């Protein structure tokens, strides 16, 4: 489980993480998240192939039912046919209602997944902003210190060249300034390698936009099929029901296919979310070559992990204090004797004030709480909202596949019964919800009131 403060793997993550991981040779594979390794990829593909097996079973059931329908329908008596027509019609209606319920679940799951991915991209952009701010603050401060060393401190050395005690103080100040610049330059741990957090956020957002749109189109397609199927049954439009039956067959393939993809994604995501710290550390270090101590500091952010920048920050703080003391002594003792040095000392003092302000801002940015919060928010978005959304999408695909399987089996019998609806209605069951005679009686009864 993750040791990150503020994140704990959910119970559904734990359950999915315990799903057996088996490769194509039916050998058990380690469930540690390793998408770059072929055995782990085989395990996810094996899970996805379960949906393919379900598709094959549903196709066999459909074929068996249709063969039985074509061969045995003529042998049924009138009472049996009438009763079966009513059952078939209600079966179609029930399948459509279940499919509509699944569509509602799918819309919710798609929205939850999108919210989770949006939280991930937002956290990545925040982290990128923090890292960029650290680099800019360090580079600006180092440039400011270097410019003061090249100009004002060099001029002060020339002014105090004949006074050894003042010259020693200026040279000590120069060494302290150079030391601060060196310490700050070594703190900059993120050199902006690709992919940086912002580039990763853009890539994730790009993929999510197309994923969200694809599911919206699939959900709308399912909804349109359900509505037109109900319309065809209610109006007894044979050609419309036939078209919806054919389209339902293709959507059945999409439903089982999406279910396989969602099943593999859910299990893979649970493997990552059960222990994200190790994978994030290994991948980040492999890509960026950042010191492992720095990564551990920001990922864990607890009292057991020491701040890797503490020594450099402490040395820089002491150097700034020494510079302040030396400048105060020069202003008190040297300015009365060398009035021309006052302007340069004021410039150096302004540099010191600016550097101290930047230093305190840098200390706040380097604190682990900011980047760790972004890290935890990204984990929560991916492993809470994202995982929940994928599970709801998985349920949608399953309900949709079952509904379309039932509809494909039921609709042929339904359209066969109302193909001659204009000829005779006497053999239709009165309990049929779409009986035209019953509809006419209801209209006549309303008009007589």
From Swiss-Prot:
GO BP term (any one): L-glutamate transmembrane transport
Glycosylation sites (chain numbering): 128, 282, 353
Site (Essential for the formation of the channel-pore): 163
Annotated compartments: Cell membrane
Cytoplasmic side: 65-86, 234-238, 410-449
Keywords, comma-separated and alphabetical: Cell membrane, Chloride, Chloride channel, Disulfide bond, Glycoprotein, Ion channel, Ion transport, Membrane, Transmembrane, Transmembrane helix, Transport
Lipid bilayer topology: Multi-pass membrane protein
Gene Ontology terms for molecular function: volume-sensitive chloride channel activity
S-S pairs: 273-383, 301-368
InterPro entries: Tweety (IPR006990)
Keyword set includes Disulfide bond: yes
Catalyses which reaction(s): chloride(in) = chloride(out); L-glutamate(out) = L-glutamate(in)
Broad class of the protein's primary localization: membrane
GO cellular component assignments: chloride channel complex; plasma membrane
Entry's transmembrane regions: 44-64, 87-107, 213-233, 239-259, 389-409
Biological function: May act as a calcium-independent, swelling-dependent volume-regulated anion channel (VRAC-swell) which plays a pivotal role in the process of regulatory volume decrease (RVD) in the brain through the efflux of anions like chloride and organic osmolytes like glutamate.
Family: Belongs to the tweety family.
Protein's name in the database: Protein tweety homolog 1
Species whose genome carries this gene: Xenopus tropicalis (Western clawed frog)
């Amino acid at each position: 489980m993750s040791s990150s403060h503020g994140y704990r793997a959910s119970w559904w993550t734990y359950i999915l993480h315990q799903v057996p991981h088996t490769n194509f040779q039916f050998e058990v594979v380690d469930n540690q998240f390793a998408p770059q390794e072929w055995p782990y990829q085989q395990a996810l593909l094996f899970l996805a192939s379960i949906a393919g097996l379900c598709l094959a079973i549903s196709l066999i059931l459909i074929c068996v039912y249709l063969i039985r329908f074509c061969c045995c329908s003529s042998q049924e008596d009138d009472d049996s046919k009438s009763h079966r027509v009513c059952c078939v019609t209600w079966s179609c209606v029930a399948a459509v209602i279940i499919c509509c319920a699944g569509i509602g679940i799918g819309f919710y799951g798609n929205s939850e997944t999108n919210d989770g991915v949006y939280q991930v991209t937002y956290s990545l952009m925040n982290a990128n902003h923090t890292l960029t701010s650290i680099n800019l603050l360090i580079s600006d401060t180092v440039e400011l210190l270097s410019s003061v060393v090249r100009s004002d401190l060099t001029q002060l050395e020339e002014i105090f060249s004949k006074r050894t005690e003042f010259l020693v103080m200026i040279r000590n100040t120069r060494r302290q300034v150079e030391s601060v610049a060196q310490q700050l330059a070594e703190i900059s741990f993120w050199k902006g390698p690709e992919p940086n957090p912002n580039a990763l956020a853009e890539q994730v957002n790009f993929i999510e936009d197309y994923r969200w749109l694809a599911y919206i189109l699939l959900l709308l397609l399912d909804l349109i099929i359900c509505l037109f199927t109900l319309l065809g049954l209610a109006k007894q439009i044979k050609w419309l029901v036939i078209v919806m039956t054919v389209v339902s067959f293709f959507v059945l393939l999409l439903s089982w296919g999406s279910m396989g993809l969602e099943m593999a994604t859910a299990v893979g995501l649970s493997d990552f979310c059960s222990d994200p710290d190790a994978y994030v550390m290994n991948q980040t270090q492999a890509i960026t070559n950042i010191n492992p101590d720095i990564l551990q500091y920001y990922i864990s952010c607890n009292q057991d992990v020491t701040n890797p920048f503490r020594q450099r920050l402490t040395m820089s703080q002491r150097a700034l204090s020494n510079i302040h003391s030396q400048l105060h002594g020069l202003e008190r003792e040297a300015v009365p004797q060398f009035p021309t040095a006052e302007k340069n000392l004021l410039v150096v003092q302004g540099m010191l004030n600016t550097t101290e302000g930047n230093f305190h801002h840098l200390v706040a940015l380097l604190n682990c709480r900011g980047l760790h919060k972004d890290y935890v928010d990204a984990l929560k978005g991916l492993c809470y909202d994202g995982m929940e959304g994928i599970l709801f999408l998985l349920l949608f695909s399953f309900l949709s596949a079952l509904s379309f399987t039932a509809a494909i089996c039921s609709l042929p019998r339904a359209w066969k019964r109302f193909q001659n609806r204009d000829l005779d209605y006497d053999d239709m069951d009165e309990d049929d919800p779409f009986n035209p005679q019953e509809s006419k009686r209801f209209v006549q009864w309303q008009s007589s009131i």
